[in-house]
Amino acid sequence: MKKSTLDKFPLLKEIPEEKFPNHVLIIPDGNARFAKLIHNVPLIGHRKGAQVLKTVLKTLQDLPIRIVTIWGFATDNWKRSKQEVEGLMVIFKEALDEVLPELLQNKSRFIHLGRKDRIPKYLKKTIEKVEDLTKTNNNKILCIAIDFGGEDQTFRIMQAVRNLPKDSEINLDVLRKLRDGHGEIPPADLIIRTSGE
């Protein structure tokens, strides 16, 4: 039987639950640089990074952390080579297919953050399937930000506000609901950048 994170690191049991962050944001950075160090192509680094992230997610599942967000692909990442972008999209699809049974078993929910209009149809379909199958789960939340950027989200919110009926009341609650995640995802309490920067 596999040991839980709390069994492996018993000192964690001494930390009161309220001291743990509610929302952890992971920015998996440095995968392409790692691949270059081992004289390989960037996609090898991204695949290795995805494997490490799966281990991290399993570790976090044992802790009283409610929301984990992985910022997998920023809006400016479209500037990367076509081969790298296409490879990343395949990795995201494979990762979602792989994580779905665990989300269902743990009664956890999946939420995509970012645009869906520019990603490949096969990935959009997988994202929508995983979101739909987990939408009633209320244990923990896993978010993956794909084609996400703060400025882009702000621009999309402004467009949505402009399209509201003229007599609509605009307040902070309305603006929160127009954010990706429909206002359910608070700002991160802890940000981990895997490259260590």
Regions found by a protein language model. Give the residues of each.
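Flexible, compositionally biased loop and terminal segments
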Residues: M1-E197
